[in-house]
Amino acid sequence: SFGSGELVXGEXPXFEKIIVKGIDAEVASAPMQVML
């Protein structure tokens, strides 16, 4: 999912939901910050 999220930067909300389902939100915070 990380690869898809990085490719689709505009899908931040959808990407966040996917991460929450697959991985803890805390873990998702790091990649999200790097993307921004």
From Swiss-Prot:
It comes from the Eukaryota. Keywords: Blood coagulation, Calcium, Gamma-carboxyglutamic acid, Glycoprotein, Hemostasis, Hydrolase, Protease, Secreted, Serine protease. One of its GO terms (cellular component) is extracellular region. Transmembrane segments: none annotated. GO terms for molecular function: serine-type endopeptidase activity. It is an enzyme of class 3 (hydrolase). Inhibited by SERPINA5. The keyword Magnesium does not apply. It is found in: Secreted. Forms a heterodimer with SERPINA5. This is Thrombin. The lineage of its organism: Eukaryota, Metazoa, Chordata, Craniata, Vertebrata.
